[in-house]
Amino acid sequence: MTKIVRSKYKASRRLGVSLWGDSKDAFNTRNYRPGQHGQNTMIKTSDYGLHLKAKQRLKCYYGRVTEKQFRNIFALAQRMKGNTGENFIGLLESRLDTVVYRMNIAPTIFAARQLVSHGHIKLNGKKADIASIRLKEGDIIEIKESIQQIPLIQESISKQGQTTPGYLSFDIPSLTGKYLRVPALSDVPYPFEAEVHLVIELYSR
């Protein structure tokens, strides 16, 4: 896990934003790229480079979703009715690992995915161990009793009410959450400017 933490902070510096809004993020004090020439600000980014960076930021933010998964999500969003960008974010935000993270059951998206893959999360009363499962309105999330008292989980849950977005609910006494609705892009609490339109333009070429 320590390697993941170091790696994610390095990603923030490489991509030029504090990806998860973490106070420990090295980007807050060294807001330039890692490496020997990181402080060289004279490098001009091409139009393609700007689009690519917007995509890399979102992929990294959602726990380094693979390129194949990301493209498949875009393809599905494109086939759906409505705005492709809104659909795209709605699909990403309905993933089980994302919802576990948003509910503050886990402190990071990486920890959330680990909880899911290790079978510590229940979906509608049944074990769910696939991070990419897409939730529907009204779906219920529970934490298995065997991990409810783990300090890391308790500390994360204590932040309930501070950052849990309005499209989710979480009941602390029962440690049960509910997926209320598909969020709009404006509902999602990104700690950086998520330039979704650039990602859509890149994949639409």
UniProtKB/Swiss-Prot annotation:
PROSITE patterns: RIBOSOMAL_S4, S4
Residue ranges constituting the S4 RNA-binding domain according to the UniProt record: 94-157
GO cellular component, one term: small ribosomal subunit
UniProt GO molecular function: rRNA binding; structural constituent of ribosome
Keyword ATP-binding: no
Matches recorded under Pfam families: Ribosomal_S4, S4
Secretion signal span: none
Keyword terms of this UniProt record: Ribonucleoprotein, Ribosomal protein, RNA-binding, rRNA-binding
Keyword Zinc: no
GO BP, sorted A to Z: ribosomal small subunit biogenesis; translation
SUPFAM superfamilies: Alpha-L RNA-binding motif (SSF55174)
Database matches in PANTHER family: 30S 40S RIBOSOMAL PROTEIN (PTHR11831), SMALL RIBOSOMAL SUBUNIT PROTEIN US4M (PTHR11831:SF4)
Subunit comment: Part of the 30S ribosomal subunit. Contacts protein S5. The interaction surface between S4 and S5 is involved in control of translational fidelity.
HAMAP family: Ribosomal_uS4_B
Stated family: Belongs to the universal ribosomal protein uS4 family.
Function in brief: One of the primary rRNA binding proteins, it binds directly to 16S rRNA where it nucleates assembly of the body of the 30S subunit.
Protein's name according to its UniProt entry: Small ribosomal subunit protein uS4
Source organism per UniProt: Rickettsia prowazekii (strain Madrid E)
Lineage, highest ranks first: Bacteria, Pseudomonadati, Pseudomonadota, Alphaproteobacteria, Rickettsiales
Gene transcribed to yield this protein: rpsD
